[in-house]
Each structure stands twice: as structure tokens, then as C-alpha cells.
């Protein structure tokens, strides 16, 4: 089991990671591994101490559904992650296009009057993240891909030899 670090107090320091690990070991009947936040407080402003978090047991780094919009912060975090062999998990979305949305545009969202986002928001977010991965050489997993528009970008990244994977939702 690998819980996400989007807890009430973000898992963004070795101390919070070690606390979560101890708590899981004491209460879970299954083996758990911990992910840590990529940025402090998952706010996208300052990267976490990736090396110390790896030493404390983190197996990957993610800000979960929060997009790191500052490309300088993301570039720095991806560079550190690459140097340390760490996996970064991103939620590819363009935050401007996806703000307030709860579903991807389509019949389902329309019939239920759910605030929707164009599939282009995912594609734009993924294209940006993959460009940053190409620049830094980091290992990257695109979390919760939900549109066909994202697939060509992933295919191109794999053809270029980038170390990328994806999950679907």
C-alpha cells in the first residue's frame, strides 16, 4: 500500500514521513511504503528536501492533485530527483483551464450539470511536464490520465527514450 502525501499535514519532511511510517507499521496489516510531497506544504513554491526524505524512506515524490505551476521550482525538483534516482509523480493538468472542474467535458458531465474541463487541459499539462522531464532526465509518472488526447504525448516521450509511465483514472 502506498498512501499519498496529501494528508492534513503534508508529508513534506523526514519527521512527518517517519511518523506516518511508524503509524502505518503499528496499525496496518499490509506492508506500506511512503510517498512524500514534492514541494513544501504541496504549495508548489519550494521543493522539499528530497535527499533527506529518500533517506527517511520515501519511494516517490508528488504534490498529488496540486500542480506545481512554477516551472523553475519543478525544474529544480526534477533535477534533484534525477540526481538521486527518485521518481516524481505528477498530475498533468493546466490549472487555468481545469480550475473549478470536477469532470472531463462530455455527455456524462453535461447530463449531470457537473463543472467540466476540456481534455486539452490534461494534454497541455502533460506536454509541459514531459518537456521538463526531457530537459532534466528525471523519472516521471503521469498520474490519473483520463483522456485520449494525452496518449500521443506519452507515446512520443517513450519513443524519445524518456523514463515515463502513466496511470489512468
Mark where each language-model region is.
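Active-site neighborhood of phospho(di)ester-bond hydrolases with catalytic His/Asp-centered motifs
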Residues: 2-5, 33-36, 62, 91, ...
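Active-site beta->alpha loop and helix N-cap motifs at the rims of alpha/beta catalytic domains
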Residues: 37-43
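Generic hydrophobic/packing signal
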Residues: 24, 28, 36, 54-57
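Metal-associated gating/positioning segment near the N- to mid-region
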Residues: 1-27
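Short, surface-exposed acidic/glycine-rich loop or hinge patches that mediate macromolecular interfaces
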Residues: 7, 40, 145-148
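Short, conserved acidic/polar surface loops in the N-terminal third of protein domains
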Residues: 12-13, 44-46
Amino acid at each position: 500500500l502506498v498512501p499519498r502525501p496529501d494528508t492534513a499535514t503534508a508529508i513534506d519532511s523526514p519527521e512527518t514521513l517517519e511518523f506516518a511510517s511508524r503509524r502505518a507499521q503499528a496499525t496496518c496489516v499490509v506492508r506500506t511504503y511512503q510517498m512524500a510531497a514534492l514541494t513544501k506544504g504541496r504549495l508548489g513554491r519550494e521543493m522539499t528536501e528530497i535527499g533527506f526524505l529518500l533517506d527517511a524512506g520515501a519511494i516517490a515524490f508528488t504534490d498529488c492533485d496540486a500542480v506545481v505551476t512554477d516551472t523553475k521550482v519543478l525544474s529544480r525538483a526534477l533535477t534533484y530527483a534525477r540526481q538521486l534516482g527518485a521518481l516524481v509523480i505528477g498530475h498533468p493538468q493546466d490549472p487555468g483551464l481545469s480550475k473549478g472542474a470536477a469532470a472531463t467535458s462530455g455527455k456524462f458531465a453535461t447530463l449531470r450539470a457537473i463543472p467540466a474541463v476540456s481534455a486539452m487541459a490534461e494534454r497541455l499539462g502533460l506536454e509541459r511536464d514531459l518537456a521538463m522531464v526531457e530537459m532534466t532526465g528525471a523519472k516521471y509518472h503521469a498520474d490519473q490520465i483520463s483522456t485520449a488526447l494525452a496518449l500521443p504525448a506519452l507515446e512520443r516521450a517513450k519513443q524519445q527514450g524518456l523514463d515515463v509511465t502513466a496511470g489512468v483514472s
